[in-house]
């Protein structure tokens, strides 16, 4: 069975990998391990720290390595390869592809073919906007402002583009619209209910990542 290590930003991403991705990947003969980023205390770390962990995993035998972190949380001083230059690229998907290429190129040449770089545009919670009906059906009318969430979903070409201000990031929208919203618990229950197929259908960059992992060669 093929093995993929996905280094995760935090518990939300780990639960998503274990509860949503893993069952599907096992059907394709692939097992997933989802360790958290080391030395982060929750959240993203500078590229140098993350790179060291990625390289250490890549030196394990017979494994591909990826990552699941939010674009929204990366700071300028984290010095991700190509970060400043990427800001000149207006198309967000092209910007992500540019960053993916720069990250891969920054690893030792002999490891690059087993590295599957990924950054979630703009953050994990954007994936939950893939099916607003699921959000509505999981809460009582007095617990959720479905109008705000539907307007956000309708405003953008796809859920990955939802983010025009720190106060209107997907997680902030969900926190305002859903009473008592818990990122780790609700995030993954909702993702499981929406289903991987629907998320892939609505989120093209995410779907590219899934395809890349499912089609890895030993």
Mark where each language-model region is:
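Catalytic nucleophile-elbow at a beta strand-turn-alpha helix junction centered on a G-D-S/GDSL motif
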Residues: 6-15
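C-terminal accessory helical subdomains adjacent to catalytic cores in phosphodiester-
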Residues: 14-37, 51-218
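Short beta->alpha junction loops
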Residues: 35-45
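Extreme N-terminal starter segment of soluble prokaryotic enzymes
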Residues: 1-5
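Short, glycine/acidic-rich beta->alpha junctions
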Residues: 46-50
């Amino acid at each position: 069975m093929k093995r993929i290590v996905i280094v995760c930003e935090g518990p939300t991403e780990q639960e998503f990998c274990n509860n949503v991705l893993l069952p599907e990947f096992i059907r394709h003969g692939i097992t997933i391990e989802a360790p958290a980023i080391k030395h982060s205390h929750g959240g993203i770390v500078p590229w140098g720290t993350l790179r060291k962990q990625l390289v250490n995993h890549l030196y394990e035998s017979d494994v591909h390595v990826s990552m699941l972190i939010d674009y929204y949380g990366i700071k300028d001083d984290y010095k991700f390869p190509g970060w400043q230059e990427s800001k000149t690229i207006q198309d967000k998907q092209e910007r992500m592809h540019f960053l993916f290429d720069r990250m891969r190129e920054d690893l030792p040449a002999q490891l690059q073919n087993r590295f599957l770089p990924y950054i979630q545009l703009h953050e994990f919670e954007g994936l939950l906007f893939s099916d607003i009906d699921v959000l509505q059906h999981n809460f009582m009318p007095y617990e959720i402002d479905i109008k705000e969430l539907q307007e956000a979903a309708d405003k953008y070409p796809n859920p990955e583009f939802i983010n025009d201000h720190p106060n209107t990031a997907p997680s902030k929208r969900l926190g305002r619209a859903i009473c008592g919203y818990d990122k780790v618990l609700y995030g993954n229950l909702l993702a499981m209910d929406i289903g991987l197929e629907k998320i892939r259908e609505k989120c093209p960059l995410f779907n590219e990542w899934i395809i890349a992992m499912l089609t890895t060669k030993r």
